[in-house]
Structure formats: structure tokens, C-alpha cells
Amino acid sequence: MHCYKLTIAYDGTNYSGWQIQPNASSIQQKIQEALCILLKKEKVVLVGSGRTDAGVHAKGQVAHFHFQDYIDLSRLHVSLNGLLPRDIRIKAVEPVSPRFHSQYSAIRKEYHYYLHLNKVMDPFQRLYSWHFQRKIDVNILKKAAILFTGTHDFTSFANEAHRGTAAKNPVRTLYRLDIKPNEGGLRLEFEGDGFLYKMVRNIVGTLMDVASHKRAIEEINQIFAAKNRRQASLAAPPEGLFLIQVFYENENGCLD
């Protein structure tokens, strides 16, 4: 059995998210359907590195599938993009070790969150950034961001998953949370060893409340200590969030 790795970019605006859901259109579903047609199979199981919610975008989602035969990958690459909607693109198709798993072999991920801070929203950014209309103190924002880096129990910043249970291990390491200037606003860059459900959006929501003086910066450590989602702020909207890249140990994407 051979394993193949896809690197995928998509505009999540018109989808219910990555994961297949009943009576809804998902990115995973669209790609699986295209693979079934091209590989002439009734079922192909595509496994993503993690799910993204409705309205969330990706520049570097990773997924894998298994197939019993060798595949002409150049032809498959072109054919997939020919079948898929224009808001989903396959950036690369690669053979990897049969032991590769897009989720469990990942060692870290990078997300970006885009903020639009101008008084008037740029209509061309409305689906790809959060139009934040309160005045903010960027220096406070940067100081608050530092408090999230390192290894923490992120229970207070994680929603329960759809299955009704929180992650078994809420401890994650955030290697960096950088605040960068971006056209019309700011870009928040997150890189960590893994992220809980809605963790990035919940952190952004809390950071923006602190930066706009709605909450005090001293509350952040209290929120961590509470281990209670209700203590953090509301989640930032999905449209500003992008999955940028998933990192693996080896070039072929497989851990030794």
C-alpha cells in the first residue's frame, strides 16, 4: 500500500470547514470526491493534519491517502486541480513513507491571523481579516502576546470539540506569537507544537480585548490559572485565520 501526501490551499468562505459533515459542503469532501473519480474508486479516505472551521482559510494544509498502486503524480496533480472548485488548489502531490500520518507525524504548525484596523473596511479584505473597530495600543498587544509563549495549559483558550469532550492533553507549547504590520492593520503569527480546538481564535479575541483596554493585561495569567473557557474572551471571527504551514521531521514528511 502506497501513501501520498497533498499540500492544499483553499478559501474557506463557502465551506462548512475542512471536515466532512452531513448536509454541508466541506473541503475534505470535495477532494475525496475528485480522488474517487480520478482513481476510479468508490471510496478514498483523505486524512487532514487537522480540521479548520467554516470560513477559515489555508495556504498549507496537509493531507494523506493510501492507494494500492503507483500513481502518475504529475497527471494526478493537474487532473485534481482541473476537477476541483477554483477556491481549492492542490499545491503539491508527493509520495511518502507508508508510516506517514498528516496529523500524528506533524511536529509543529504555523497560523496567521489578520486584523484590519482602518476606519473603513477594505471590501477586498472583508473575507480574509477581522475588521476591528476599537482603538488599540499595539505596545500593550505585544506585551500581552509574550504571556502566551512557552508551555502552558491552554484549557481556558480551547472550546470543546464537536464530540463533546475537550482535548485529553491541553498542554501546548507556543514557540512564537509575533505581531507584524500588514496592509491596513496587523498580522499575528502563531507557531506551536499543536493547537487545541479554536485556540488561536480564542487567544486573538482575548488579546484584542486587552489591547483595546476592555480587559487588563494582568487578567491573562488569571485566565490561564482558571482553566475555564468562560474566563477568556469571545473567539475572534473565523475569516481572519489562515493555516500557513504544517511542519514534519523529515523532508518526505515522515518521522523516523
UniProtKB/Swiss-Prot annotation:
Its EC number is 5.4.99.12. GO terms for biological process: tRNA pseudouridine synthesis. The keyword tRNA processing applies. Pfam families: PseudoU_synth_1 (PF01416). The active site is at residue 53. It is an enzyme of class 5 (isomerase). Keywords: Isomerase, tRNA processing. Substrate binds at residue 111. SUPFAM superfamilies: Pseudouridine synthase. It comes from the Bacteria. It catalyses: uridine(38/39/40) in tRNA = pseudouridine(38/39/40) in tRNA. GO terms for molecular function: RNA binding; tRNA pseudouridine(38-40) synthase activity. Transmembrane segments: none annotated. The keyword Nucleotide-binding does not apply. Belongs to the tRNA pseudouridine synthase TruA family. PANTHER family: PSEUDOURIDYLATE SYNTHASE, TRNA PSEUDOURIDINE SYNTHASE-LIKE 1. Homodimer. Formation of pseudouridine at positions 38, 39 and 40 in the anticodon stem and loop of transfer RNAs. This is tRNA pseudouridine synthase A 1. The gene is truA1.
